[in-house]
């Protein structure tokens, strides 16, 4: 993964190695917003909105074109959760709508906690983009290990986190079924 590589400063200051700027005074409210709407931010992440907003290396027309898949998926989910299910619930439409909204926020909070705990810990290192351009395959594997962190807990925690408590193994073997991460974790350690 490239989650540990900083081409430019991100939304949040997640490491002491990132130079402090006054905009980082908003880290806490921005982090809360990111957690509540995590599913949408994940969907928008690959659009690189900062390229149009800040760096001016992309036009809004390009962003709109790049967002076609995201818009289609978002439209389907919004219609399903906030129109279809409430409508078929009839007189219970409002509780269903509220329940779907609450469930989506809870899922976003949980997902963000799992992802943040695997990527932005004291032990996880960050790397500058120019340091990884010509890295060897061995250096890539080492960066995957050094750029993420595992967290421990009960079997239920591993199940409820989709086994992403084994973030290092997830980065090393992204195609491996998640339930196998715990088998290879001792060998990686």
Predicted regions and their residues:
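Histidine-centered catalytic micro-motifs
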Residues: 1, 115-123, 165-176
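Short, small-residue-biased leader/transition segments that mark boundaries at the very start
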Residues: 2-6
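Hydrophobic transmembrane alpha-helical segments that form the core helix bundle
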Residues: 7-144, 149
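Membrane-embedded and juxtamembrane structural elements of multi-pass membrane proteins
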Residues: 11-15, 26-33, 156-171, 179
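C-terminal, well-structured subdomains that either form a transmembrane helix-short loop-helix hairpin
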Residues: 98-101, 105, 159-188
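Cytosolic-facing loops and C-terminal tails of multi-pass membrane proteins
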Residues: 132-163, 167, 186-189
């Amino acid at each position: 993964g490239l989650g540990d590589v900083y081409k430019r400063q991100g939304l949040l200051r997640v490491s002491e190695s990132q130079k402090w700027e006054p905009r980082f005074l908003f880290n806490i409210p921005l982090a809360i917003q990111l957690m509540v709407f995590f599913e949408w931010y994940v969907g928008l992440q690959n659009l690189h909105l900062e390229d149009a907003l800040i760096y001016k290396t992309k036009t809004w027309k390009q962003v709109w074109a790049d967002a076609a898949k995201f818009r289609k998926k978002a439209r389907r989910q919004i219609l399903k959760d906030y129109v279809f299910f409430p409508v078929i619930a009839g007189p219970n439409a409002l509780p269903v709508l509220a329940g779907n909204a609450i469930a989506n926020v809870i899922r976003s909070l949980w997902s963000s906690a799992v992802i943040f705990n695997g990527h932005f810990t004291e032990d996880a290192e960050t790397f500058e983009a120019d340091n990884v351009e010509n890295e060897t395959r061995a250096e890539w594997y080492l960066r995957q290990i050094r750029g993420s962190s595992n967290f421990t807990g009960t079997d239920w925690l591993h199940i409820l986190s989709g086994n992403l408590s084994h973030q290092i193994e997830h980065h090393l073997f992204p195609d491996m079924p998640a339930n196998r991460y715990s088998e290879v974790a001792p060998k990686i350690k």
